[in-house]
Swiss-Prot record:
Glycan-modified residues: N55, N110, N452
Protein name: Matrix metalloproteinase-27
Gene assigned in the entry: MMP27
UniProt-listed InterPro entries: Hemopexin-like_dom, Hemopexin-like_dom_sf, Hemopexin-like_repeat, Hemopexin_CS, M10A_MMP, MetalloPept_cat_dom_sf, Pept_M10_metallopeptidase, Pept_M10A
Listed GO MF terms: metalloendopeptidase activity; zinc ion binding
Species whose genome carries this gene: Homo sapiens (Human)
Protein residues bound to Zn(2+) 2: C91, H216, H220, H226
Primary enzyme class: hydrolase
Chain residues that bind Ca(2+) 4: D286, D377, D426
Residues annotated to bind Ca(2+) 1: D121, E199
Length: 513
């Protein structure tokens, strides 16, 4: 009997422990949220006062403000997407308050900087290089010039610090969390830039890239606030990118030039039209889409067309098919009704065969995108589910082609919905059940059922080039015949149009027989 009583008491104790663990986790999440909102959104609630209804209402309002800034679904609730953003390493400068606006800049163009101490994570020369290149990001688009000094007081004093440090009113929090902070132009701490020494700083390996973080913090030291443009350098969260190919977004350029102006204008040199080469090892695509039994690859003013299971590749001007379409398209996809949608900036066009449908272009916001979305990076329609994924920076939206509405619960981070695809997507399409994501000159074959990358290849693998050729390879603008792996690239518009017509005539005839 005693054994039964002991077992019963053990069972009651063991089973009652689970709700306590869950409650503790919820409390920890709420405390994390309170600290985050205090630091970055001026919540100004001290201590553990979350149970008060007034304070909880303030927290909900600040969560809504934070969700709106990061492009999340605005609910005021501490959902998983909101927590994920709060736990992402970021800059220590607030997103609102006096730092939520672009501040007055320096009253001079020639600025000095000094590195007070160095991180042991990197060679001194590598730190010098990262700092110099971080400043050059801004001097390349403004009249600003930066000079390094080794003694005395510089306009921008740079240091690696930990936790509470010196007279600085901001502090660091150990590994992860806050990576750095900087102060806007002015006397005293103005322009000073600090990096958290508890982080693992790196040039190109595992850890946090010093150049990327420094370039961001120097934006603050020059007077910029945070941007909610997810492609901007001044976006508050750390995004791992290839530093060698890192461009400032137009939002960054507009912001810094609103303070200091642009570079002196030089006489514009007439540009010769560039023609992309299929076997260029650095070839990238603006957009890719299927069209019935074809795949179309868009680049500048041109497109390549390949047919399923046929080795011929055709190369044409976009205008030879659709004269009213602009060049430099940014995204394209085929919907379940055999129509192509192509996107550039805030507009999209719908194509049926050789015809651009009337009443186009239309605004992308008619599809359900919020006003902050200014362009689409890539799009792909899953033929099985009839759902279209739109990629915008590090986020993706999902559109229901049957109801013509955006799905609830989106946007989501790309890496969350497509594990392994961690940063922005340049182009995407579906072929034989797989998604193909292009980023730069690489393409990732992705199994959407197992959510795994199954193959990594060059973007021009589809053209079966035997060996990459130099991108400066010369060829006739009117006609190029390149024999690579049995592929013949045709430039004659009349012949390509004839083939296109015959293929689709045979297809349509077979369907209705």
């Amino acid at each position: 009997m005693k054994r039964l009583l002991l077992l019963f008491l053990f069972f009651i104790t063991f089973s009652s422990a689970f709700p306590l663990v869950r409650m503790t986790e919820n409390e920890e999440n709420m405390q994390l949220a309170q600290a985050y909102l205090n630091q970055f959104y001026s919540l100004e609630i001290e201590g553990n006062h979350l149970v008060q209804s007034k304070n909880r209402s303030l927290i909900d309002d600040k969560i809504r403000e934070m969700q709106a800034f990061f492009g999340l679904t605005v609910t005021g609730k501490l959902d998983s997407n909101t927590l994920e953003i709060m736990k992402t390493p970021r800059c220590g400068v607030p997103d609102v308050g006096q730092y939520g606006y672009t501040l007055p800049g320096w009253r001079k163009y020639n600025l000095t900087y000094r590195i007070i101490n160095y991180t042991p994570d990197m060679a001194r020369a590598a730190v010098d290089e990262a700092i110099q290149e971080g400043l050059e990001v801004w001097s390349k688009v403004t009249p600003l010039k930066f000079t390094k000094i080794s003694k005395g007081i510089a306009d921008i004093m740079i240091a690696f610090r930990t936790r509470v440090h010196g007279r600085c009113p901001r502090y660091f929090d150990g590994p992860l969390g806050v990576l750095g902070h900087a102060f806007p132009p002015g006397p005293g701490l103005g322009g000073d830039t600090h990096f958290d020494e508890d982080e693992n700083w790196t040039k190109d390996g595992a850890g946090f890239n010093l150049f990327l973080v420094a370039a961001h913090e120097f934006g603050h030291a020059l007077g910029l606030s945070h941007s909610n443009d997810q492609t901007a350098l001044m976006f508050p969260n750390y995004v791992s990118l290839d530093p060698r190919k890192y461009p400032l977004s137009q939002d960054d350029i507009n912001g810094i030039q609103s303070i200091y102006g642009g570079l002196p204008k030089e006489p514009a040199k007439p540009k010769e039209p560039t023609i992309p080469h299929a076997c260029d090892p650095d070839l990238t695509f603006d957009a890719i889409t299927t069209f019935r039994r074809e795949v179309m690859f868009f680049k500048g003013r041109h497109l390549w067309r390949i047919y399923y299971d046929i080795t011929d590749v055709e190369f044409e001007l976009i205008a030879s098919f659709w004269p009213s379409l602009p060049a430099d398209l940014q995204a394209a996809y085929e919907n379940p009704r055999d129509k192509i949608l192509v996107f550039k900036d805030e507009n999209f066009w719908m194509i049926r065969g050789y015809a651009v449908l009337p009443d186009y272009p239309k605004s992308i916001h008619t599809l359900g995108f919020p006003g902050r979305v200014k362009k689409i990076d890539a799009a792909v329609c899953d033929k099985t589910t009839r759902k279209t994924y739109f990629f915008v920076g590090i986020w993706c939206w999902r559109f229901d082609e049957m109801t013509q509405t955006m799905d609830k619960g989106f946007p989501q981070r790309v890496v969350k919905h497509f594990p392994g695809i961690s940063i922005r997507v340049d182009a995407a399409f579906q072929y034989k059940g797989f998604f193909f994501f292009s980023r730069g000159s690489k393409q990732f074959e992705y199994d959407i059922k197992t959510k795994n990358i199954t193959r990594i290849m060059r973007t021009n693998t589809w053209f079966q080039c035997k060996e990459p050729k130099n991108s400066s390879f010369g060829f006739d603008i009117n006609k190029e015949k390149a024999h690579s792996g049995g592929i013949k690239i045709l430039y004659h518009k009349s012949l390509s149009l004839f083939i296109f017509g015959i293929v689709h005539l045979l297809k349509n005839t077979s369907i209705y027989q």
